[in-house]
Amino acid sequence: MGIFKAAAIQMRSGKEPGRNAVEFEALVREAAGRGAAYVQTPEMTGAIIRDKADRATAFRPEDSDQIVASARRLSAELGIFLHVGSTAILRDDGKIANRAFLFAPDGALAARYDKIHMFDVDLDNGESWRESATYEPGGEALVADIGMAKLGFAICYDLRFPALFRAEALAGAEVLTVPAAFTRQTGQAHWHVLLRARAIENGAFVIAAAQGGQHEDGRETFGHSLIVDPWGKILAEADHDEPGVIVAEIDTAQSAEARKKIPNLRNAREFSVASVSAFEPAALRGAAS
């Protein structure tokens, strides 16, 4: 559909939304200054906070959120598509959403996406996470047409659920977006391979803006923001823990070409799953007949 420059912004968001908004604006301006027509920020751009009491004072409804207001203004001023990877939003029902926003070059809100899969895990290093205790999961995938490309939306832990990305690719997505705040431990093990796999298996670009470094609340995120092409080649990569901007050219014709070379979207078949037991020979004989 088009050729354009895309930017992924790496941040180290702290507990104070106001300070994060200042860094957010500076980095967005840098990205636009480098020619990016689409700019993506990481998950939890607004604030990274573990303490429940601090969250209660920091999280705001959409209409009074600082990052949302800044993004609306900046997208119009700079004439860019600005994708806030996510920020915590207090919903009308009192629940909290981990919500992404896409603003158009005229400042209009083009799309929202709420993170679907909650990160509820216990890691080997003692870290324990229960996102479902704080956030209300979304229930709808999203593909947004921005003229230059069709974007498929995801946030962080969604990356581990390939069916989401396949559904978006089948719906026309040529660029898969994965703003994230991966832990250092899981990022070292899985970040690069998962992002490249999602690109390869769907014949799509992947843009993944990340949080990186040691945060005020004690957590450490992996960084390494990436832009990957449909063949799995890394086009741009950020450092582990330094805030900054990476930029790469996106040519959606490369997505069409990758899908022509490896037409797995077209070749996919529905199938059933048989279940047998090696300890029940009769069942095995039945499956073979």
Which residues make up each language-model segment?
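CN hydrolase (nitrilase-like) catalytic-core segments centered on the catalytic cysteine
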Residues: E62-H83, K150, C156-V245
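Cys-nucleophile CN-hydrolase/nitrilase-fold catalytic domain and related Cys-dependent amidase chemistry
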Residues: P17-G18, E25-D106, R112-D114, T183-R198
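Short, acidic/polar
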Residues: R19-V28, R160-R166
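Active-site-proximal beta-strand elements of phosphoester/diester hydrolases
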Residues: I3-K15, Q40, R99, R112-D114, ...
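Active-site catalytic loop in hydrolytic enzyme cores
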Residues: R91-A171, R184-V193, K261-N264
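Short beta-strand scaffold segments in enzyme catalytic cores
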Residues: V84, R99-L102, L142-A144, S225-I227, ...
